[in-house]
Each structure stands twice: as structure tokens, then as C-alpha cells.
From Swiss-Prot:
Zn finger limits (FPG-type): 247-283
Gene assigned in the entry: mutM
UniProt organism field: Cereibacter sphaeroides (strain ATCC 17029 / ATH 2.4.9)
Protein name: Formamidopyrimidine-DNA glycosylase
Gene3D superfamilies: 1.10.8.50, MutM-like, N-terminal
UniProt keyword annotation of DNA repair present: yes
GO biological process terms, semicolon-separated: base-excision repair
EC number(s) stated in the UniProt entry for this protein: 3.2.2.23, 4.2.99.18
Co-factor note (free text): Binds 1 zinc ion per subunit.
One GO MF term: damaged DNA binding
Sequence positions that bind DNA: H100, R119, R162
Length: 283
């Protein structure tokens, strides 16, 4: 599933084609994805101007001139693809099978935005812009990890006394929004913390020290265009590149990259997810 860096990369890729532009025509090719589309969605989108594109956790919101926002969740395999206009040097057209094109937005200026989702775990909804934060998918989310509300004091307070593994705590979207399996593995490696260690056992310094590392990993991943492991592509069809710099994720059996460490990257399963770590470096 695309995590925060991938969703932010897609948002940035959509901006040149969508922000400030009119939706000349919207087409909806099926009744639902993970959930039913809102009634008359194509009709309600057609003629609307996209005022801005923003991201909340792993969701993209397109604020529209009529006072509503189009909420987009990519799910497991969803892609927002830009085609029909040469918008940049790295434009790659439409690489996905068209039979999975579920929503198409013909934009003012000639660009076509296609929501392509082979597995159909994605979602789109329309919500009043002023009430967007109250949407059931957004209302339960914690602070953004790149925002000012997420700081060392906040995280230390949320982890204090918790008897869940630190990895599970960081994946809890109520504590911090947008983190997923890949980036939590990478953060914990840089922090020297074992994924199975209880969150409440961290010292205040250890808890506070996670915040700059979370930001560091996320910003590096955004700069690299995210991580392409299975279905993820940027809006122009380009692959992300952060997977080439993974230090532990997906490296089971390979040597630890820490200078002087003789350890080997291991894998354990926590709540059905693979956790990659160095048993020597991470305590």
C-alpha cells in the first residue's frame, strides 16, 4: 500500500495538471471500488475548478470551487495517472491496463487524470471542504509526522506506558498519521531500536529521538519519489527510487550496512507484517 512519501509524490505530480484548472468532463466507469462512489459523482465533478491539492496522511484531497473536496485513497494498487498533455520532461504516459480505468477527469488544458486500480481497494468520495477533517477516514488520524504538532514531547507522551511493540505504536494511525511498514522499519534501524521492544520501555530521549529520524526518512523518500515495490508509480508513470537505498527493508540475510557491524539483517513477523532489523544494532 502506498505510504506517505508515495502519496505526497503523487500529489505533487498531479498539481501541474489539476491545480487551478477546470474539470471539463468527469467519467465514472463503475459504481464502486472499495465502497460505492457518491451519487452522481461524475455530474458533480464536471465543471468544478480544482482550487488546490493537499494531502492528509495517505489521502489526497482536491478542494473544488463548489465547496466540496474530492477525497482520494489509492488503496493497495491504485494509481493516479496523467496523460494527454506533455507536462514535464519525465512524462511517461499511461502504462497501466485501461480496463482498470475507473474514474477519468478531462482537465482544462488537455490533461487527462485517470484513477486506475486493478485490485479495487482504492476509494473516492466527495465531502464538504469545511468538514473534511470530520470524514470517517480522517477523523481518527493523529498529527502529520512532518507537521509542527508532531514533536518529541508529543511522541514521548503517547508512548509512555504503552505495552505494545514500538513498531505497532508507530504504525498506529491514531498516534501519527501516514507511516507504514517500510518506513517504520527504516526509522527503527536508524534509531537502533528493536521492532519488538515495548513502546513504554523507551526512555524519553529515545522517544524524542524518533521524531527527527521519522522526518529524515520521509523527506529522503519524498525526494526519491517514493518506493516502487509492486504497483506504485508516480503520476507521470515514473518509478520511485527510495527502494534502492533501503538499509533493512527487504534485505533479509544480507549483511548489516552499519560500518563495523558483523550482523545479518533478520526478519520477524509482527501482526502479519514482516519486520526487518539487525539483531546486533537494534536493541
Amino acid at each position: 500500500m502506498p505510504e506517505l512519501p508515495e502519496v505526497e509524490t503523487v500529489r505533487r505530480g498531479l498539481e501541474p495538471a489539476m491545480a487551478g484548472r477546470l474539470i471539463a468532463e468527469a467519467r465514472v466507469n463503475r459504481a464502486d471500488l472499495r465502497w460505492p462512489f457518491p451519487p452522481r459523482m461524475a455530474e458533480r465533478l464536471t465543471g468544478q475548478r480544482v482550487l488546490r491539492l493537499r494531502r492528509r496522511s495517505k489521502y489526497i484531497l482536491a478542494d473544488l470551487s463548489g465547496g466540496q473536496s474530492l477525497l482520494i485513497h489509492l488503496g493497495m494498487s491504485g494509481r493516479m495517472l496523467v496523460s494527454g498533455a506533455q507536462l514535464g520532461e519525465f512524462f511517461h504516459g499511461h502504462p497501466a491496463p485501461s480496463r482498470h480505468d475507473h474514474v477519468v477527469l478531462e482537465m482544462e488544458g488537455g490533461a487527462r487524470i485517470t484513477f486506475n486500480d486493478a485490485r479495487r481497494f482504492g476509494a473516492m468520495d466527495l465531502v464538504a471542504t469545511e468538514a473534511a477533517e470530520a470524514h470517517p477516514l480522517l477523523a481518527v488520524l493523529g498529527p502529520e509526522p512532518l507537521g509542527n504538532a508532531f514533536d518529541g514531547a508529543y511522541l514521548a507522551a503517547r508512548l509512555e506506558g504503552r505495552r505494545t511493540p514500538i513498531k505497532a505504536a508507530l504504525l498506529d494511525q491514531r498516534i501519527v498519521a501516514g507511516l507504514g511498514n517500510i518506513y517504520v522499519c527504516e526509522v527503527l534501524f536508524r534509531a537502533g531500536l528493536a521492532p519488538g521492544r515495548l513502546a513504554g520501555s523507551l526512555s524519553r530521549a529515545e522517544a524524542e529521538g524518533l521524531v527527527p529520524l521519522i522526518r529524515e526518512v520521509l523527506l529522503e523518500a519524498i525526494e526519491a519519489g517514493g518506493s516502487s515495490l509492486r504497483d506504485y508509480r508516480q503520476a507521470d508513470g515514473e518509478l520511485g527510487y527510495f527502494q534502492h537505498t533501503f538499509r533493512v527493508y527487504g534485505r533479509e540475510g544480507l549483511p548489516c550496512v552499519t560500518p563495523g557491524c558483523s550482523g545479518t539483517v533478520g526478519r520477524i513477523v509482527q501482526s502479519g507484517r514482516s519486520s526487518f532489523h539487525c539483531p546486533l544494532c537494534q536493541r
